[in-house]
Amino acid sequence: MRREGTMRLHRTFLLRVYLKESAVITYPASKKIYCQGKIFPTIRVGMREIQLTNGDSLTLYDTSGPYSDPNISIKSPQGLPRLREPWIKVRPRKTQLAFAKEGVITPEMEYAAIRENQKRELKKNTDQERERRLQGNSLSARIPNPITPEFIRNEIACGRAILPANINHPESEPMIIGRHFLVKVNANIGNSSLTSSVEEEVEKLIWALRWGADTVMDLSTGKKIKEIRETILRHSPVPIGTVPLYEALEKVDGDVKALTWEIFRDTLISQAEQGVDYFTIHAGVLNRFIPLAQKRVTGIVSRGGSLMAKWCLLHREENFLYTHFTEICEIMRAYDVSFSLGDGLRPGSIADANDEAQFAELKIQGELNRIAWKYGVQVMNEGPGHIPLNLIEENMTKQLAYCREAPFYTLGPLTTDIAPGYDHIGSAIGAAFIAWQGCALLCYVTPKEHLGLPNKQDVKEGLIAYKIAAHAADLAKGHPAARQRDDLLSQARFEFRWHDQFNLALDAETARLFHDETLPKEAAKHAHFCSLCGPKFCAYKTSHEVRDTLQKVT
């Protein structure tokens, strides 16, 4: 016991050192600002404001939480400030869905609405022709301007959106997931049986927040799962999701046959008590669907799906996640944990896309959605996977129909199988397309997909690829908060305001680094050319000259 206590103190010391030295998130030419609520005046919604050299500014959705506020001291092991605790204490113990159905707007709903607008309601564009031309095609989505707390309440009540916010995760900053809102991106972290520690996972969490992760899933499968999860939750301002099956399996030393409903139930309660915001539950993998996957090229590629299929065959019984689904609903309702219904039969190769097994499970997901809603539990549906571009639209169409417009949460999809080491690119192509079609949450893919556990650089590259995909979809949908950043960056580029161009980029450091590889001096930041075209062939420079000539003529 003494040795175990000493080790725990040592880990706490290491975490304190890390948080003291490395847990500050900074962005160039940016400051933390706060927007006040109107329905709930005590609400202060943190955002990022970029200051431009011409006097303009841009307000951005910010996932960095208190880590980017120099006035907030983050202490370990206590973790982040408990933002939602005062709201939770003074109201009945109900889910956000239950409140929404009763017509009640919660502080979380107003908070999420303020985040979605990013102060865009204060900015008016006077070029009406340009607005009409670039208004976007939202397909069947309805995106109001501005987004109001009442609109968010109604979307939650109808099951078209979720606000994942476990009552035991008061550190989280409320956010909304649904196709009528900004497309969100999830990052996966977590240890394996071979590598990683508590300190490394907290470092990965904060790194993911730095690069824009809207939600984070802890997919730890090795030792110290509970300790890692507790530390992540206490230090996370974004919703945290898990796959409880992984810890349940760890409790029986990886013996699938020894897994029972009782072990899983206790694991579920334990994780809900800690504060996990959403659970991936593979309740749609039914006995009768397992043979459908046998003719596939790559079989069952979902970890949770393959484990439950094996359990069903070993016991010759139906999936206990399905047979005990109402009991799972009761547990999740008690803590306001949201469902992320797992796609255990998702295709793991282009050859298996849109097959009978995949869509059979999707139909069951839709049935389970309706049960979850009956119990007042929020739900979203997980989707593929590996899908060629020409089959992506069918996935979105079927999900909207089978699942009654519940939020769709997809892993990519990867549009080709030939890109190991570059799967973040191949999948971001599919992610942009399906997000435009209506997918609400994109699970990022890193360059290490299919190859190994991602490191910090992999996390960054995966998130950048997926933030591009999400933003491209927001532009295509015509989200009112999407285009201003593009316009400001384009103006800075045309006016040769190099520092502004860098600072408005998703990755300012890389943009500046690439420019400075050939033109490193400060004088080059004021030059009217870059190394690609040089001073004589720069089209922007020539375009300025053309404008000047036309003005003189007219």
Curated annotation (Swiss-Prot):
<feature type="binding site">
    <location>
        <position position="282"/>
    </location>
    <ligand>
        <name>substrate</name>
    </ligand>
</feature>
<keyword id="KW-0456">Lyase</keyword>
<feature type="binding site">
    <location>
        <position position="530"/>
    </location>
    <ligand>
        <name>[4Fe-4S] cluster</name>
    </ligand>
</feature>
<keyword id="KW-0408">Iron</keyword>
<feature type="binding site">
    <location>
        <position position="450"/>
    </location>
    <ligand>
        <name>Zn(2+)</name>
    </ligand>
</feature>
<feature type="binding site">
    <location>
        <position position="382"/>
    </location>
    <ligand>
        <name>substrate</name>
    </ligand>
</feature>
<feature type="binding site">
    <location>
        <position position="188"/>
    </location>
    <ligand>
        <name>substrate</name>
    </ligand>
</feature>
<keyword id="KW-0784">Thiamine biosynthesis</keyword>
<comment type="pathway">
    <text>Cofactor biosynthesis; thiamine diphosphate biosynthesis.</text>
</comment>
<dbReference type="Pfam" id="PF01964">
    <property type="entry name" value="ThiC_Rad_SAM"/>
</dbReference>
<feature type="binding site">
    <location>
        <begin position="343"/>
        <end position="346"/>
    </location>
    <ligand>
        <name>substrate</name>
    </ligand>
</feature>
<keyword id="KW-0479">Metal-binding</keyword>
<dbReference type="InterPro" id="IPR038521">
    <property type="entry name" value="ThiC/Bza_core_dom"/>
</dbReference>
<dbReference type="Pfam" id="PF13667">
    <property type="entry name" value="ThiC-associated"/>
</dbReference>
<dbReference type="GO" id="GO:0051539">
    <property type="term" value="F:4 iron, 4 sulfur cluster binding"/>
</dbReference>
<dbReference type="GO" id="GO:0009229">
    <property type="term" value="P:thiamine diphosphate biosynthetic process"/>
</dbReference>
<feature type="binding site">
    <location>
        <position position="217"/>
    </location>
    <ligand>
        <name>substrate</name>
    </ligand>
</feature>
<keyword id="KW-0004">4Fe-4S</keyword>
<feature type="binding site">
    <location>
        <position position="538"/>
    </location>
    <ligand>
        <name>[4Fe-4S] cluster</name>
    </ligand>
</feature>
<dbReference type="GO" id="GO:0016830">
    <property type="term" value="F:carbon-carbon lyase activity"/>
</dbReference>
<keyword id="KW-0949">S-adenosyl-L-methionine</keyword>
<feature type="binding site">
    <location>
        <position position="386"/>
    </location>
    <ligand>
        <name>Zn(2+)</name>
    </ligand>
</feature>
<keyword id="KW-0411">Iron-sulfur</keyword>
<comment type="function">
    <text>Catalyzes the synthesis of the hydroxymethylpyrimidine phosphate (HMP-P) moiety of thiamine from aminoimidazole ribotide (AIR) in a radical S-adenosyl-L-methionine (SAM)-dependent reaction.</text>
</comment>
<dbReference type="GO" id="GO:0005829">
    <property type="term" value="C:cytosol"/>
</dbReference>
<feature type="binding site">
    <location>
        <position position="533"/>
    </location>
    <ligand>
        <name>[4Fe-4S] cluster</name>
    </ligand>
</feature>
<dbReference type="GO" id="GO:0009228">
    <property type="term" value="P:thiamine biosynthetic process"/>
</dbReference>
<keyword id="KW-0862">Zinc</keyword>
<comment type="subunit">
    <text>Homodimer.</text>
</comment>
<feature type="binding site">
    <location>
        <position position="409"/>
    </location>
    <ligand>
        <name>substrate</name>
    </ligand>
</feature>
<feature type="binding site">
    <location>
        <position position="246"/>
    </location>
    <ligand>
        <name>substrate</name>
    </ligand>
</feature>
<feature type="binding site">
    <location>
        <begin position="302"/>
        <end position="304"/>
    </location>
    <ligand>
        <name>substrate</name>
    </ligand>
</feature>
<dbReference type="InterPro" id="IPR025747">
    <property type="entry name" value="ThiC-associated_dom"/>
</dbReference>
<protein>
    <recommendedName>
        <fullName>Phosphomethylpyrimidine synthase</fullName>
        <ecNumber>4.1.99.17</ecNumber>
    </recommendedName>
</protein>
<dbReference type="GO" id="GO:0008270">
    <property type="term" value="F:zinc ion binding"/>
</dbReference>
<dbReference type="InterPro" id="IPR037509">
    <property type="entry name" value="ThiC"/>
</dbReference>
<dbReference type="InterPro" id="IPR002817">
    <property type="entry name" value="ThiC/BzaA/B"/>
</dbReference>
<comment type="similarity">
    <text>Belongs to the ThiC family.</text>
</comment>
